[in-house]
């Protein structure tokens, strides 16, 4: 037997080797450990060791004596010192030896010894009690551990130290019986971390309490009440092996007190102990749970932390004594941050000794063999270590997740849907009962963020940043070390130095170093140069990065041409490295080639994937291998997945298949995805051997594949890895087909991965099936590629890679070196001068903070998802901010520096806010204020955020705060000189905390309630930019995933396609999908979008927040500020299409397109839909670039003239306002600023989707979450339609409307009719938005002045079968006034005086209540339509009849209100499909925004009217002085002019807020198109009347409520649009609802002609309006002409193609005849 001490030390060095030794050595080691510790204890403690030893031995079962010795042992046990073993302990050692035979790790053995006496429960509880008493009498913890007075000595089961195993107890001990997991019968023994104690359930209830009595720790009282199932946990926590604690702590000379518990776990200790007290005390009660969770995580996920005490110490040491270079060294990538030279030293010896262990499917299959013994210490093969020494596996029970695809299996972890990236930040997802699965999945799937596992390179050159961000999209490839290209990128082919050597501690090492000039050195003053370093050891992590020359203390002068001595650079960066051992590499090209191989050894872009075919009723490996041929469903799947290739002669990646003799089959399946080549080993394509049931020829290939796809036909039994026997198969992706070989074929996916394979994306949405489509194919290919990459991180493959790496390094160090050492001399480096220079040139303070790479700090981060604190490494580069958990070595948080909006810094902590106000809370490890100061300074350098400001707000006499806030938490308006204004609150400020509650966790409604109800309102705000625009994250301003403009055949950017893409139909399994709109989807028969929307269900709220964009973006490209992305709230049915996708997929960024003004405005999506459009035959369907141009110009002109461009509230138009522009008076504070963003699902993928349209929100348009506004009445959605609501009725069109209005169904139940401002708009907007830009929200937006560019979508003919979103329905409200002909039956909204016109889009799923009654109002927007595209006619469109949603009945209304409501989704889908054709996003104006301003203005116009809600909830308005009016804005017709340009100009939230305040617009007055022939005099009169109305609350009723022209130049379009313009079809253009007569009528209706003169603005507006109308008319004419030309061109094209084909055929015939004739002649 080898010397125990020696082996022990080796184990320590290796860190993880402990479990790999056989029992005998382990015993010896343990003895050694124990002896050393005992000795130490004797020295320090009173009782003699001998006595203790004898007692413990004799007692053997828990006698009191036992306890005594145990105490001392425990005290020092964790300390691995060099004391020699003592004889005193011999007896105990002997006993220990017995236990050791079963112990798994050295720690376990130690523990067992320590626990021997007491652990033994065989003696019964009495003994135990005596034991405790005795121990207590003899020594109190106070005596032994001064710092831990209350820790019971209780030696027994308290071990919490990492490797000790509870199950290491005497074979005879009764404990064994108790130490069995009641669920599995498995012996509970320690794995790593304190988890072992957690798993230990041996204690009986009485024993447990006896133990508690012994400890006498009050803290545990509450635990006693915990269900008995957790005793093991208590065991682990309660005075958790104070000895172990003490051991580790003593080794450092410190104790840790965590919430009253001594909890020292080697895996968790690190620096945490020091910090924990600080953090933990803040939340003492949650500690246990969090610890429990944490432990569990450590145990199940990271065997890496099974450290022996020595390794622990090294880690602790590392945490305490960071490298000198840590701060100044800028890391290139994530794995470099994880590089730990101390760990490399400790594990070096282990490299050659790592054994292959049973992993993958074999581990699972072997557990069954000894059925009863799964839980025993012995594995099926005889040794747990054999089974999985990597984790010291005890019988793993699996994760308990099962479904009809896959069953829970030992040693495997399942992904059944809903799993997402870990979230530690404080966000709504973590704060509410969020279906984390869905939300995470979707967000991660659709968001522009890089997933945690997808973050690799942190240093991104400025010129590559846009491209880099674009790469972060659809289906991110994860777990790939892209930093491996560091050498190739920065060294290869350039002047640099390589040094190789064999370090006595590190083994073979290789260093590459290069000095380079810093490109962007202006701010860095002296930092003209930096040194790039790549340092490689046998460990797989490499130190890669750069250090600025000014940050290096040196004897030489900085900034000279010669540079600093390399020796000084290396000594500073890697002080642990022995520079003397390094020799310069030989000058051979082979050196660089070898280094490239070494660095890129882990990169592979060729993967082989197995595919097993499982028929109905099958589940076993043998059955699957014996399926000789594929069925039609499997063939269909294979055709989708890749292309069949003939193997013979195949020259690409063949994955060991025979391409010469067909011995492995004649064909195989091959495909490529991104940069990857995939060859599939398909079981049915590999040779079948009828006489060999095992089908070895097939298994030979598939069994050696790491990732296997298991294809299940309907009726197949759930898959379990237990049925597979293979050491290599680590991941199984199960794909089950539904409705095979039909148009509705779809697939559900599940994953089962070996427990040591980290999770990987893309996440599987919960309860969703994927339609057969290219998107599903991309999803599946990304999943298997990520699975392969992740599997290579498992211990088995890492061990193999490490051995290979070590050999490479050895070869370099031995065969490719010269005798030259590292150059230490520098010309003229005199010692004296050097010393002076060193002082003088001492690293320039904070020079490193200007580095491009990631500067790293040790911090403690608050994990809000698990309510725990975790020790992390914080890295901040020029592109990313990320946190890596030290224990798991996983990235747990990342965000782009561009998304950081602010931070709150304290002395030793900092809270960083990003995106929409989400935040991460960090504190320094050693309460080091310097760290926080540096972090803040670094943030200032790399982000556009700022320090937050805390202020306490007072209420005025009316209880108002004096400002409005939109759903995003952005202050839309502040009452001048009010209390809020005096406190320093300004428009554009962003609230991130209200009364200590993070705004990111609140819905708009909750936010408003908090502001309204809190006695003292304390807010933390982020000040706006200098120009007054709110600070926004980049992902809010523009959806990153707009990239990869490479289009696929469908015209959709390939990268963007997501499984949820609009062309795909996702079905939420549980819910029936609504009938999809017919659309050209790649797969015939697949409905355009189905339930996919459900996917989005994630949270409506989530999306809403970010609707607004920062107006700063010049191009307005931001499609949706918030990335509103995926979150459109799909209805419960989820059937709604996924809106967000559209944004991604369908359009590149519409905004961008618009911006360009290029005709291509049609987004890809639009193009995709072109077919549909054509079907509708609305030429207008297509967007032409010009309109956008035009609009932009109008906008600019008008706005600029006004100067309101930025300020005009109109700009605020919220696109998202689906709902009636969420007048959120409910917002109270937010006071209508909020637009309902929620409702509007942005990016739902509908054509109408603003995102698609590219009309992203105009200037900060904040889409309110409809939440607060829900109560709003559907403010008349139709601007024009406002007729009902507005006094002015559009008589001329009234009849038409009448029909539509007639939707009498709802009439019957007027009371029931609710238009939720949010929902109605959502619905209508949703529909409208989707279908027609004119939707409620749209309309309202329009009216608000937002110009909504019509969506190009043509009105789909009814044939499409869905209501035309373009239809407008008018609902009259309580106001008795009805528009003639329009809703003949007024609907009374309770409390609402106004009538509203509601344009609902019929949700696809919901039957239109009286469709027949509803008539389309095709003419409404005709003029605008042209521009916006007939499809947009949304509101007005005639198809509405059938499709129109009538007024909603109460039930429908409620449904709409529910985010999940299928109606909403359907509507949404529908609209989006039609309406969204236009690439531009329609702009929606939010009443609320306006109202805020107007209220503030105090002018009667007060926007208050603008929001319907306002009237209803006047009190909501925080400060408005004027009574709120319900005014519904008339929906704007799509302002055909391109909204895109508008977009830029107005970003709602931001701009509008500010603008509003500047311009008071009395409610917006809709201006009719000149086409209507409206007389200007009438217009003036109307305006006056309008003003007069303002004075009257009823004015609020005016649906019009159009904003000022100036602000709403776009809105003027609305009227025009409203005029039932010509249908795309060429329907005659209906005069605007308001004709001159109508105009008068309008005034008449108003009845109150207000004499008040309009200010000079009217004249100005008139001029602008005339010009705009003229331009508009011209544009329309041009557009009509262009449309006609396009149509002709198409026809000509078709004709030419036919003629071409005919000519070709004739030519062919002629040729044949010619040659035939010649042949005959010859």
Swiss-Prot record:
Region (Disordered): 1-29, 42-72, 360-401, 1067-1245, 1330-1360
Signal peptide per UniProt: none
Pfam families referenced in this protein's UniProt entry, alphabetically: PDZ, Rap-GAP_dimer, Rap_GAP, SPAR_C
This protein's record includes keyword Phosphoprotein: yes
One Gene Ontology term, aspect cellular component: glutamatergic synapse
Modified residues (Phosphoserine): 148, 379, 383, 1029, 1244, 1461, 1472, 1478, 1488, 1549, 1552, 1591
Keyword Iron on entry: no
Listed GO MF terms: GTPase activator activity
Keywords attached to this entry: Coiled coil, GTPase activation, Phosphoprotein
Comp. bias regions, Low complexity: 1093-1102, 1119-1130, 1219-1236, 1337-1360
Coiled-coil segments: 1654-1712
An annotated GO BP: regulation of small GTPase mediated signal transduction
Domain Rap-GAP: 595-812
Record field: compositional bias (Basic and acidic residues): 1-12, 383-401, 1164-1183, 1194-1217
Feature: compositional bias, Polar residues: 45-56, 360-377
Domain PDZ: 950-1026
Protein name stated in the entry: Signal-induced proliferation-associated 1-like protein 2
Gene coding for it: SIPA1L2
């Amino acid at each position: 037997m080898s010397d125990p001490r020696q082996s022990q030390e080796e184990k320590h060095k290796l860190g993880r080797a402990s479990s790999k030794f056989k029992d005998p050595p382990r015993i010896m080691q343990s003895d050694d450990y124990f002896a050393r510790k005992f000795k130490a204890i004797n020295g320090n403690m009173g009782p003699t060791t001998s006595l203790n030893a004898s007692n413990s031995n004799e007692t053997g079962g828990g006698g009191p004596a036992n306890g005594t010795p145990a105490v001392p042992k425990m005290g020092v046990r964790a300390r691995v010192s060099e004391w020699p073993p003592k004889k005193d302990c011999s007896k105990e050692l002997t006993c220990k030896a017995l236990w050791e035979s079963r112990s798994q790790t050295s720690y376990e053995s130690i523990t067992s010894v320590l626990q021997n006496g007491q652990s033994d429960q065989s003696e019964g509880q009495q003994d135990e009690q005596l034991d405790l008493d005795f121990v207590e009498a003899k020594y109190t913890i106070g005596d032994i551990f001064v710092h831990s007075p209350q820790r019971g000595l209780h030696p027994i089961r308290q071990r919490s130290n990492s490797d000790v195993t509870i199950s290491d107890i005497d074979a005879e001990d009764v404990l064994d019986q108790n130490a069995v997991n009641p669920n599995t019968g498995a012996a509970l023994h320690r794995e790593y971390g304190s988890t072992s104690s957690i798993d230990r359930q041996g204690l009986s209830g009485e024993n447990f309490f006896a133990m508690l009595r012994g400890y006498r720790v009050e803290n545990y009282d509450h635990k006693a009440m915990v269900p008995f199932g957790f005793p093991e946990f208590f065991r682990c926590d309660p005075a958790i092996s104070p000895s172990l604690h003490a051991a580790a702590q003593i080794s450092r000379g410190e104790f840790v007190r965590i919430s009253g518990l001594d909890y020292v776990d080697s895996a968790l200790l690190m620096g945490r102990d020091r910090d924990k007290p600080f953090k933990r005390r803040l939340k003492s009660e949650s500690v246990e749970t969090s610890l429990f969770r944490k432990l569990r995580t450590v145990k199940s996920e990271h065997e890496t932390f099974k450290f022996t005490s020595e390794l622990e110490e090294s880690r602790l040491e590392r945490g305490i004594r960071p490298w000198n270079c840590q701060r100044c060294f800028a890391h290139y990538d994530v794995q470099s941050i994880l590089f730990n030279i101390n760990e490399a030293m400790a594990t070096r010896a282990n490299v050659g000794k790592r054994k292959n262990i049973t992993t993958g499917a074999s581990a699972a299959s072997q557990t069954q063999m000894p059925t009863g013994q799964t839980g025993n210490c012995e594995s099926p093969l005889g040794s747990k270590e054999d089974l999985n020494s990597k984790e010291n596996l005890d019988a793993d029970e699996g994760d308990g997740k099962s479904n009809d695809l896959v069953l829970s299996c030992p040693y495997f972890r399942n992904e059944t849907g809903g799993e997402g990236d870990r979230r530690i930040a404080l966000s709504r997802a973590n704060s509410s009962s969020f279906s984390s699965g869905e939300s995470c999945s979707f967000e991660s799937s659709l968001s522009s963020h890089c997933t945690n596992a997808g973050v690799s390179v942190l240093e991104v050159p400025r010129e590559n940043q846009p491209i880099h961000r674009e790469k972060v999209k659809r289906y991110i490839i994860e777990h790939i070390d892209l930093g491996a290209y560091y050498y190739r990128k920065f060294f290869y082919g350039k002047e640099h130095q390589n040094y190789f050597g064999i370090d006595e501690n590190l083994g073979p090492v290789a260093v590459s170093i290069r000095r380079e000039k810093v490109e962007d050195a202006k701010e860095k003053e002296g930092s003209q140069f930096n040194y790039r370093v790549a340092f490689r050891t046998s460990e797989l992590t490499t130190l890669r990065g750069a250090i600025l020359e000014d940050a290096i203390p040196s004897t030489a002068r900085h900034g000279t041409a010669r540079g600093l001595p390399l020796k000084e650079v290396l000594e500073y960066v890697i002080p642990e490295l022995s520079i003397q051992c390094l020799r310069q590499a030989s000058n051979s090209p082979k050196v660089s080639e070898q280094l490239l191989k070494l660095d890129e050894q882990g990169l592979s872009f060729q993967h082989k994937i197995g595919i097993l075919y499982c028929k109905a009723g099958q589940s076993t490996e043998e059955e699957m291998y014996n399926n000789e041929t594929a069925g039609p469903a499997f063939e269909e799947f294979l055709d989708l997945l890749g292309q069949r290739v003939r193997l013979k002669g195949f020259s690409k990646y063949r994955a060991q298949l025979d391409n010469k003799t067909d011995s492995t089959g004649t064909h195989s399946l091959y495909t490529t995805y991104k940069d990857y080549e995939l060859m599939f080993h398909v079981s049915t394509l590999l040779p079948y051997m009828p006489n060999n049931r095992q089908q070895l020829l097939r298994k030979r290939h598939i069994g050696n594949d790491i990732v296997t796809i298991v294809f299940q036909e309907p009726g197949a039994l759930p898959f379990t890895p237990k049925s597979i026997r293979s050491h290599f198969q680590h991941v199984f992706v199960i794909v089950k087909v539904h409705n095979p070989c039909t148009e509705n074929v779809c697939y559900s996916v599940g994953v089962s991965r070996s427990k040591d394979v980290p999770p990987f994306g893309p996440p599987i949405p919960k309860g969703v099936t994927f339609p057969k489509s290219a998107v599903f194919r991309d999803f599946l290919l990304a999943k298997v590629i990520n699975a392969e990459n992740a599997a290579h991180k498992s211990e088995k493959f890492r061990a193999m890679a490490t051995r290979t790496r070590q050999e490479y390094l050895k070869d370099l160090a031995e065969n490719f070196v010269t005798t030259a050492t590292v150059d230490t001399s520098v010309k003229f480096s005199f010692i004296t001068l050097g010393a002076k220079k060193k002082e003088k040139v001492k690293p320039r303070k904070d020079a490193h903070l200007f580095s491009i790479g990631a500067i790293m700090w040790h911090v403690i981060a608050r994990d809000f998802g698990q309510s725990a604190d975790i020790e992390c490494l914080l890295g901040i580069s020029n592109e990313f901010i990320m946190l890596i958990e030290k224990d798991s070595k996983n990235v747990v948080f990342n965000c782009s520096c561009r998304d950081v909006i602010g931070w709150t810094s304290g002395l030793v902590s900092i809270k960083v806010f990003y995106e929409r106000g989400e935040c991460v809370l960090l504190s320094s490890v050693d309460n080091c204020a310097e760290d926080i100061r540096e972090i803040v300074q670094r943030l200032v350098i790399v982000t556009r955020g700022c320090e937050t400001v805390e202020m306490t707000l007072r209420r005025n006499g009316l209880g108002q705060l004096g400002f409005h806030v939109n759903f995003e938490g952005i202050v839309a308006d502040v009452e001048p000189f009010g209390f809020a204004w005096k406190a320093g609150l300004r428009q554009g400020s962003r609230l991130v905390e209200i009364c200590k509650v993070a705004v990111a966790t609140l819905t708009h409604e909750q936010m408003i309630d908090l502001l309204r109800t809190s006695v003292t309102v304390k807010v933390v705000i982020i000040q706006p930019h200098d120009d007054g625009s709110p600070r926004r994250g980049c992902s809010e301003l523009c959806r990153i995933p707009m990239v990869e403009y490479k289009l696929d055949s469908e015209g959709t950017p390939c990268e963007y396609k997501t499984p949820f893409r609009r062309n795909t139909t996702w079905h939420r399994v549980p819910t029936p999908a609504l009938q999809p709109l017919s659309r050209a989807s790649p797969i015939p028969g697949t409905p355009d979008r189905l339930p996919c929307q459900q996917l989005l269900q994630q949270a409506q709220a989530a999306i809403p927040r970010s609707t607004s964009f920062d107006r700063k973006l010049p191009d307005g490209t931001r499609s949706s500020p918030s990335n509103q992305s995926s979150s459109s709230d799909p209805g419960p049915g989820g059937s709604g299409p996924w809106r967000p996708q559209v944004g991604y997929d369908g359009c590149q960024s519409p905004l961008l397109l618009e911006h360009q003004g290029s005709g291509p405005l049609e987004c890809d999506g639009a193009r995709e839909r072109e077919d549909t459009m054509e079907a509708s035959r609305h030429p207008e369907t297509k967007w032409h670039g010009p309109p956008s141009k035009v609009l932009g110009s109008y906008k600019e002109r008008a706005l600029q003239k006004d100067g309101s461009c930025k300020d005009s509230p109109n700009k605020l138009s919220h696109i998202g306002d689906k709902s009636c522009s969420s007048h959120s008076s409910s917002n109270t504070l937010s006071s209508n600023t909020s637009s309902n963003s929620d409702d509007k699902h942005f990016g739902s993928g509908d054509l109408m989707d603003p995102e698609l349209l590219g009309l992203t929100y105009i200037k900060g348009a904040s889409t309110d979450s409809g939440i607060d506004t829900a109560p709003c009445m559907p403010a008349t959605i139709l601007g024009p339609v406002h007729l009902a609501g507005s006094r002015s009725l559009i008589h001329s069109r009234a009849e038409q409307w009448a029909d539509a209005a007639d939707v009498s169904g709802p009439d019957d139940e007027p009371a029931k009719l609710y238009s939720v401002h949010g929902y109605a708009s959502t619905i209508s907007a949703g529909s409208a938005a989707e279908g027609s830009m004119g939707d409620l929200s749209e309309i309202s937006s329009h009216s608000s002045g937002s110009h909504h560019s019509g969506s190009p979508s043509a009105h789909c003919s009814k044939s499409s079968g869905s209501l035309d979103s373009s239809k407008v329905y008018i609902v009259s409200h309580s106001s008795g006034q009805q528009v003639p002909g329009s809703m003949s039956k007024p609907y009374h909204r309770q409390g609402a005086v106004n009538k509203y016109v509601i344009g609902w889009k019929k949700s696809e799923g919901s039957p239109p209540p009286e469709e027949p009654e509803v008539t389309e109002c095709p003419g409404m927007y005709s003029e605008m339509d042209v521009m916006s595209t007939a499809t947009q006619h949304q509101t007005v469109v005639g198809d509405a009849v059938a499709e129109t949603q009538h007024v909603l009945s109460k039930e429908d209304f409620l449904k709409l209100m529910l985010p999940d409501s299928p109606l909403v989704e359907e509507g949404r889908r529908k609209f989006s499909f039609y309406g969204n054709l236009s690439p531009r996003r329609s702009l929606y104006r939010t009443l609320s925004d306006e109202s805020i301003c107007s209220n503030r203005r105090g002018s009667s116009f007060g926007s208050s009217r603008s929001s319907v809600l306002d009237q209803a909830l006047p009190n909501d308005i925080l400060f408005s002085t004027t009574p709120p009016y319900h005014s519904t804005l008339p929906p704007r017709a799509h302002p055909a002019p391109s909204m895109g340009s508008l977009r830029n100009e107005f970003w709602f939230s931001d701009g509008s807020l500010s603008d509003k305040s500047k311009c008071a617009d009395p409610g917006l007055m809709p201006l009719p198109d000149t086409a209507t022939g409206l007389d200007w005099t009438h217009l003036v009169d109307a305006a006056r009347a309008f003003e007069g109305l303002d004075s009257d609350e009823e004015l609020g009723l005016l649906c019009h409520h159009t904003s000022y022209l100036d602000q709403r130049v776009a809105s003027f379009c609305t009227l025009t649009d409203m005029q039932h313009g010509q249908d795309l079809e060429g329907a005659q253009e209906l005069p605007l609802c308001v004709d001159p007569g109508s105009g008068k009528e309008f005034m008449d209706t108003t009845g109150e002609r207000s004499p008040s003169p309009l200010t000079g603005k009217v004249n100005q507006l008139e001029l602008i309006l005339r010009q705009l109308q003229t331009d508009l008319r011209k544009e329309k004419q041009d557009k009509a002409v262009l449309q006609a030309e396009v149509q002709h061109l198409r026809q000509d094209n078709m004709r030419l193609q036919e003629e071409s084909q005919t000519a070709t055929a004739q030519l062919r015939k002629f040729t044949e005849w010619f040659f035939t004739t010649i042949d005959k002649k010859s």
